[in-house]
Regions:
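ATP/NTP phosphate-donor binding region
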Residues: 1-92, 341
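Short Gly/Thr/Asp-enriched flexible loops that form oxyanion-binding sites at enzyme active sites
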Residues: 51-52, 81-82, 101-114, 147-148
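C-terminal charged capping/lid subdomain of soluble metabolic enzymes
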Residues: 312-385
Length: 385
């Protein structure tokens, strides 16, 4: 087990009916004016937004609204949110939604007081120092952004997608009511399941295997999510399965399953190029295409063999590496996830473009058991075609 630091300050309010406490929670922490941030309108149609405003009103917390945040959020939208929060005198950004809404709020929070462009932070021209607090009302189990230190934005002017990892990104509190996820479309639920799995699967495929405690925590999380995923897709109103997915989403990406490991989220890097190229590609759907190909790439070279064998046996109950990879594909397939780049309309030419973008035309290499440069990334994308 390698040395590590782990700091998870986000307070969770978990369970049925917790969203009704948002006013009490915000007022109890001294907030006086919240900016409610949300996405495409489901929060309005479901009545959730009205319930949140009623709760804030009852506790004397003033509020404004910033809606229309899209999937695969943009730096431009983030800058508009920061400007509006500054204009309205907001002292809390309240993100109502999933990863896209939360990530936009996180990055906007760094810009409200400083007036900086959010891209300054993703490009490390500045470090977050004076950030507005962020609270979350979570509506989908997926990214784990409600407790993570990361946020991802796309610059529409350049088509570049970048992330920022910073302890300043961790929300102050997160309200997590599994019942809010029961009306999600099946495809969106399935994309979330893949995303939850991937945050731990990538960390599990580490280059230092001597970390039995974190291995077993990871295996327990993954097998629990696999089981809960099957249950939820068969019965969307299964509360216990929904609760398992929602909590697992946080645990999978708050740093716990990477503690003491040497690992990188390189399959995520490859997927980011896909959704940067076409923002209609859901992150989880893209990962469902990349991950089996990523594993196959290493298996063909006889690399990560012990890890891949353990992955096959402990996660999928398979005796061979090939069996584990196929079981992964079959699980994703059972939810209707895409299997190939062509399922998104992406071509070999697109794969070449993404390979060059991902590695900055070969100038960038990702550290792994085999360093991943331009040629390696090309091959992984080719296995996705």
């Amino acid at each position: 087990m390698l040395n590590f630091e782990l700091y998870i300050p986000t307070k969770l309010y978990f369970g049925r009916g917790q969203c009704g406490r948002v006013g009490e929670i915000a007022a109890g922490r001294g907030f006086r004016r919240a900016l409610i941030c949300y996405g495409g309108g489901s929060a309005v149609r479901s009545g959730l937004l009205e319930r949140i405003k009623t709760s804030l009103d009852a506790s004397g917390v003033e509020h404004d609204e910033f809606g229309g945040i899209q999937a695969n959020p943009t730096a431009e939208c983030c800058a508009r949110m920061a400007g509006f929060a500054r204009e309205r005198g907001s002292d809390l950004l309240l993100a109502v939604g999933g990863g896209s809404v939360i990530d936009t709020a996180k990055m906007a929070a760094h810009c409200v007081r400083t007036g900086r462009d959010p891209w300054d932070y993703t490009e490390h021209r500045a470090e977050p120092t004076d950030s507005l607090p962020v609270g979350v009302v979570l509506t989908i189990a997926a990214t784990g952004s409600e407790t993570s230190d990361s946020a991802v934005l796309t610059n529409t002017a350049t088509g570049v997608k970048r992330g920022l990892s910073s302890e300043k990104n961790r929300p102050l509190f997160a309200i997590m009511d599994p019942e809010l996820t029961m009306t999600l479309p099946p495809y969106q639920t399935a994309c979330g399941i893949v995303d939850i799995l991937m945050h731990t699967m990538e960390r599990y495929m580490c280059t230092n295997p001597d970390n039995e405690l974190i291995d077993r925590i990871s295996e327990g999380l993954l097998t629990s999510v696999i089981d809960a995923g099957r249950r939820v897709m068969a019965e969307p109103a299964d509360y216990e399965a929904r609760a398992t997915l929602m909590l697992a989403g946080s645990l999978s990406h708050n740093g716990l399953t990477g503690a003491g490991r040497a690992c990188g989220l390189w399959a995520h890097k490859l997927e980011h190029e896909m959704s940067a190229l076409d923002d209609r590609i859901a992150h989880g759907a893209g990962l469902a295409v990349v991950w089996p190909a990523y594993l196959e790439f290493f298996a063909r070279r006889g690399l990560f063999t012990e890890r891949l064998e353990r992955y096959a046996e402990k996660i999928w109950g398979e005796r061979t590496v090939e069996g584990g990879i196929e079981a992964t594909r079959e699980y994703f397939r059972s939810f209707g996830m895409p299997e190939r780049l062509s399922d998104f309309g992406l071509t070999a030419e697109d794969a070449e473009y993404m390979s060059c973008r991902c590695t900055d035309d070969g100038k960038k290499t990702f550290p792994s058991v085999l360093p991943l440069g331009l040629e390696e990334v090309r091959e992984i994308y080719s296995l996705c075609l």
